[in-house]
Amino acid sequence: MAAGCLGGQRAGPLSGTVLGNRWAWLIALPLLLAAAAAQGSVCRLKTGDGRESESCGTNLELEHSFELDDSIDFKKRGSLFWSGTAEQSISILQKQLTEDERNKLRDIANLNGLYRIRIPRKLGISEEVNEYVTSFVRACSMVESHLSDEITVHTDISGNVIGVSIVTFPGSCNGAEVEDVDLEMFNTTVHIQQPIAAAVPETAAFIERLEMEQAQKAKNPQEQKSFFAKYWMYIIPVVLFLMMSGASDAGNQGGNGGGGGGGGGGR
């Protein structure tokens, strides 16, 4: 994959004419975009607030397949433009379905067939050895949604493509009649789904709080004593008093029992 964008190609022989003439630059831009897109890297010219700026990113080819015999034959559906900014935005440019494609999609929907899409996992590699990620929906849901779908590109934490998914709105098949004009243009929303980092344990804060508690205990050693160590001088007298009271009660009960037995023997 070639490195850099069009911004790095302005120092060539065209710089004196292309940059010096705004209209010449606008005419030459599509040719330069096509050359860059073939290498997987592309830049786009944006106009806003009276100023022009470039947005560089990656061009991913989106392909689809829907065949009557349930075979797989992917053909180009459009292109995904993946910006290289920190926001990781993504947009899509798609082809219009031909009359033959619309008729074939209807036939496949009637046969309860599948509609498949795929995008490449890596750039700068020939199609013969490239790897793809794929997804599919029922062709009937694609028809009854009037080609309204949502495509999500899943990436790892480094931004590498690891999967793709597609859903339609609505996603059910109810046998509704669909006009031919509703199957001409795709109405697609695209997203990038990156992994959400797990919550990091607050180890430093926990250690700091633990050290503060230990320092506080060192200043107040009295707080470290147990309940018995703090109040033993009150507990022991109470225990001794209870023990002595119990022994005295037991002696009185024994004396009363002996006297009663002696009286019974005198009769």
Swiss-Prot record:
Cytoplasmic side: 248-267
Membrane topology: Single-pass type I membrane protein
Signal peptide stretch: 1-38
Topology, Lumenal side: 39-226
An annotated GO cellular component: endoplasmic reticulum membrane
Keywords on record: Endoplasmic reticulum, Membrane, Signal, Transmembrane, Transmembrane helix
Gene Ontology biological process: protein insertion into ER membrane by stop-transfer membrane-anchor sequence; tail-anchored membrane protein insertion into ER membrane
Subcellular location: Endoplasmic reticulum membrane
Transmembrane segments: 227-247
Main localization of the protein described in the UniProt heading: endoplasmic reticulum
Pfam family, any one: ECM10
Function, in words: Part of the endoplasmic reticulum membrane protein complex (EMC) that enables the energy-independent insertion into endoplasmic reticulum membranes of newly synthesized membrane proteins. Preferentially accommodates proteins with transmembrane domains that are weakly hydrophobic or contain destabilizing features such as charged and aromatic residues. Involved in the cotranslational insertion of multi-pass membrane proteins in which stop-transfer membrane-anchor sequences become ER membrane spanning helices.
Annotated PANTHER family: CHROMATIN COMPLEXES SUBUNIT BAP18-RELATED (PTHR21397), ER MEMBRANE PROTEIN COMPLEX SUBUNIT 10 (PTHR21397:SF4)
Family: Belongs to the EMC10 family.
Record's subunit section: Component of the ER membrane protein complex (EMC).
Name the record gives this protein: ER membrane protein complex subunit 10
